[in-house]
Each structure stands twice: as C-alpha cells, then as structure tokens.
C-alpha cells in the first residue's frame, strides 16, 4: 500500500492542558469536524470518544493518552489526547516525547493553571512547538486578554494572539482573524454554518492594534521581515503566515487562538492553525541515537528511504487483542508480519499486526511509514521507551526518563483466589505505566504499590477490580521520604572474622560528602598503590548501594551523597568480595554519627481556588499543615492561594477543603522538590519506624 499522505502533509500533535480546561471536548470536536465521529459525545455525560476506559467515563477525566488519526484539508493529523490531572504527568511526558507539535488548551476564565505550568515545562524540555487555544470563551467570567496575560506572567512565553474573540460569555459569537484581516461569525449551534465577513466596525480599532503587535513580534524574529517593517513596507498575509510558522516551529513564538469547543466555535480554525503553523516531521530536527556496540552517535532523518527506527511510547492491554504497543516511526517503513530488533533489550521481535487507532476502535493496516503513529500487536519484550529498529542497521534512540513515585500504600488481596490474580494484574499495570511500581516489603511481607498521587493509586486499584477482577484492601498512604547527609566525614569500616578455617577480612576508609540535589549517589575510587585490590573495588560500591537503600536514620533510601574510597587494607587469603561489601555497609553505619544525616520529604506545589470569604480559614489551614503561602491573586470573583506544602500533610485535603468551603473550593497539586523535615517531625518519623 503506497503512502496516503506525504510527510509534509502529516502532523503529529498532542493536546495538553490543566484538568477541566476542556481538552477532551476539543479533541472530540476535531474528530467530529474531520469526519471521524458521526455524533458528538459530551464529556460531562460520560460519552466522550477519546475517554474510553470505564473509569475515565465515570470520573470525566482522561487517564491514558488515546492516539487517534484524523484528516483535514488533505493532511493527516495524528492526535494524542493527554491527561491533565497532575497524577498522570508521565502520560504527558511520554506523548510529548513522540510528538512534533502541541495544542495547549487554556480555560478562558482561569488562564494558566498549575498543571498547565508543569506540562508547559515538559514541552519546553522536549522542544515541542505549541499553539495556545483559549477555550470556554462562552463561560461566565471568560476573558481572552486576561488569559493571554497569564501566559506572559506565569510561563514567561513569547505568546501573541493571532485571533480575537467577538463578544464573550453568552455573547461569544465570532472570531476575528488578525492574519487574514477578516472575521468569522457563527450561524448555528453545530458550528458548521460559518460566515466569513469583514471585521465589524466596533472591533476594527482593537484588531488593528493587535495586528500591529503581532507583526512587530514576528518581525523581531525574522530579519527580512524586520527590514520591511522598519521601512514601512506592507507585509503580505503569506509573509506573515510564513513568519509565524517559522517562529513557531523553532519554539520562539506561540500563536494564541480562541474558541469554545463545547459550543462548536473555533475548532475548524484551530485545525487550520495546526496545519498552518505546527511542524511536519520534516520540519523538526532529525532524531539522534547511538549504535549499540560502538556508542557512536548517529541520526535518523524523517524519510521512508532511511533504515526503520521507531520508539515505543505506550503499552496498553486491550480486552480483544491483548498487548498493544504504541510506537512512533521516525524513519523507514515497517510491514506487518516482519521482524524487527528491540535494540534497547537486544531482542528480536515479530510485528504480528499493525493497527491504526481511533480512540477505541481500530483499523488494521499493512504498512506504516516514517512520521506515522500506530500500534503493534505481538511484541513480547518491548516496554515503554524501547527502540525498535531494522535488524541490519541497529540504533538506540534517546529514551525517556520517568520520575520516581512519591506515595505508596500497602495492598492485600481479599481472598486466596485474588492473591494469584493480583500478581499478574500488578505486573501488567506496571508494564503499562513506568511511574507505577509494585514490590514486596522484605520485612513485613506486604505488597506495596507506589505512584504519583492518591488519584493515581485509586485508579490502579479500580482497574485491578474492573479489568482483572481482583478485589483488594488498601492501607493508609505512606510518603516516600528520603535521607541524605548534610556534613562530610571520613569513616572506617572493618569486617574481620577469623575463627578457625578460612576467615573473612575487608577494611575500608571512605570519605562521605553531600552531593547536589537530584544528582543521586556517586561513588569514586581514589585508591593509590593497590591497598585495596582492583577486583574488590566494585564490591565496595555495590555494598554501599545496597546499604543506602535501607537508610541510616529511619530506613528510607539515602540520596544525593558522594562516597570516595580513599584507603583500606586486605588479607591475601581471607579477603573476599562479600567481606568488602560488609565493610562498606559498616562504614555507612559509622557515618551516621559524623555526617549529620537528615530526613527529606516531598513538597507539593499547591494551588487552592476559593471564594473570597473563605480566605482566612484556608490560609490558617495551609499554615497548620506546615505549608508556606507563596502568593495570592484575585481571579475573577475568586481568590487563588499558591503554597508549598509537605505531601504528608495533604492526605485527605480534598475532604477538608470541601467542608471548609461548603464544596465551593478546588485545589490542584503537583510534586515540586524534596526538602529537609523539621527536627520534631523527623523524631516522630524515626520513632514510628523503629516501632517505639
């Protein structure tokens, strides 16, 4: 089957936003207008096409990024709908990694919200060009220019409107196109009756002002246009479009458009903007990778002629076909039934069938080309982040890094029958989601599951019940504390056991010192003159790593320290790897008294939105939870409190906020960093963990 759409007519985009900004509704409408859906599904009725897991339909939030293909004006648009809830940021990271562009959806009443900031940061990390769609222009309190202001203030982004709304709230009935200098008025509710008209007289002045600002902003990034602009020459529509496209694809400029997906306004114009301004696979830099054996850096260009290379970015268990592996093809062509190499794991895989996904219906295809996104059936060993490539031309594409879980709970099956199924369910779920971990606690024998937040773990337990028919009891949430050293010291670890027969002997001197935050554990060998033989040095590093996992104060993993092996001694007969491992762990224990160990706790960035009259109660509540208020602002007729609060104090906050504000307050939180625990709290944690 020949290629249906050329590479330059392909767009791989993600739709990203804060929870409730209307992202899924926007995707729905795109599918409706591109002819993929015959009846529109409303998210708040639980009928949306993209939210296809049962819980998503119940909770009205998107959990897994569904990938779907649509067509618009001779272009193929592959869309990934990403979740906006903070507990699912890993889904967003995964999809951004394989996209070429994104649409950031904002709520016209709130503008940029905390999760928008997180997602925006992630998109910046991956260098993803973005268009901003200010949605919900029909909502009470909608304010387009306020929303644009929040993009400047909170994201420090060079964003400029390329459209202006005509009216707002109930009066929102049209859009001014600043590029083409015209307006679009809507004649019916389905948004299919659009009249292109001249800009209404009463809006002309504002439109001219903002068109001038737009041209100036684009000209600043384009020398030729700048010259024309300074010389007072007219800049044509084509030149302006080309300038916006160039600046957007190089991630220097972000066009802002507006609409109301729910009221079917502005969606076709959003699709036009995706095609006009977001990059095709040819416009983004070639992906880099390394050759497995030589570590030589190579690049794969977006072309069908290059050897096949793709990245698996999502695993899903489908009730009908089993395991689905979603992948993005960067170069080359893949036919169903062929063999590929999983170069990350060094395994050969057979691609049984290739499916093109549409939310949760699917179409079988025989071939995928460079730039496509599809799902494969039949891959046994491939997990998220693995590279699939041509067996004759191996490459490992840069993989994805996932954050460590911050919260854990103990979980136990309700019956013996559930016990066996639970193991299978947990391993399948952790295969699908790299930020979800399950392990058995060595000391208590309990099964512990860990993830990115309470909602994340609720949904995992829910999925176990629905998809795997496993009933389980869940314990109280536990915070993922960490430990670290605040002072440097040189300590000795000596393990000598000579009691007849072959003894054990290992002796080390290790210098411990604090490392930079986020750098983890670093081990360095500074032995001179062979006082500790070369073959035992890895054992010292391994001994330390093992001992660090169980902490020095309260049994939490020790992070961000440096250890240098500086001296020691050995015995010709009695020394062994085991003895040096034990000596290293003894040195770590000895460091407790000298290195000033402290406990660290995860701090959450919290944003609470409340009616003004509850301000005092909420501020008091935040302070009582050891929170620091970092800022306040009025948003419409509500107050927004931004604070940094320890995760351990946020359990059950949703219930407390509801009762404090008669259900009128909302909050969102996202993990920010680790911070030292106050002494009184630290003592309590140590006592609790030692069972006192």
Swiss-Prot record:
Annotated HAMAP family: EF_G_EF_2_B
InterPro entries membership: EFG_II, EFG_III, EFG_III/V, EFG_IV, EFG_V, EFG_V-like, EFTu-like_2, G_TR_CS
Upper classification of the organism: Bacteria, Bacillati, Bacillota, Bacilli, Bacillales
CDD domains hit by this protein: EF-G, EFG_III, EFG_mtEFG1_IV, EFG_mtEFG_C, EFG_mtEFG_II
Entry function: Catalyzes the GTP-dependent ribosomal translocation step during translation elongation. During this step, the ribosome changes from the pre-translocational (PRE) to the post-translocational (POST) state as the newly formed A-site-bound peptidyl-tRNA and P-site-bound deacylated tRNA move to the P and E sites, respectively. Catalyzes the coordinated movement of the two tRNA molecules, the mRNA and conformational changes in the ribosome.
The UniProt record lists the keyword Nucleotide-binding: yes
UniProt cross-references to Gene3D superfamilies, sorted A to Z: 3.30.230.10, 3.30.70.240, Elongation Factor G (Translational Gtpase), domain 3 (3.30.70.870), P-loop containing nucleotide triphosphate hydrolases (3.40.50.300), Translation factors (2.40.30.10)
Subcellular location per the Swiss-Prot or TrEMBL entry: Cytoplasm
Principal subcellular localisation of the protein: cytoplasm
Binding site for GTP: 17-24, 81-85, 135-138
One GO MF term attached to the UniProt entry: GTP binding
An example Gene Ontology biological process: ribosome disassembly
Residue ranges occupied by any tr-type G domain in the UniProt entry: 8-282
UniProt similarity note: Belongs to the TRAFAC class translation factor GTPase superfamily. Classic translation factor GTPase family. EF-G/EF-2 subfamily.
Protein name as catalogued: Elongation factor G
A GO cellular-component term linked to this record: cytoplasm
Name of the gene: fusA
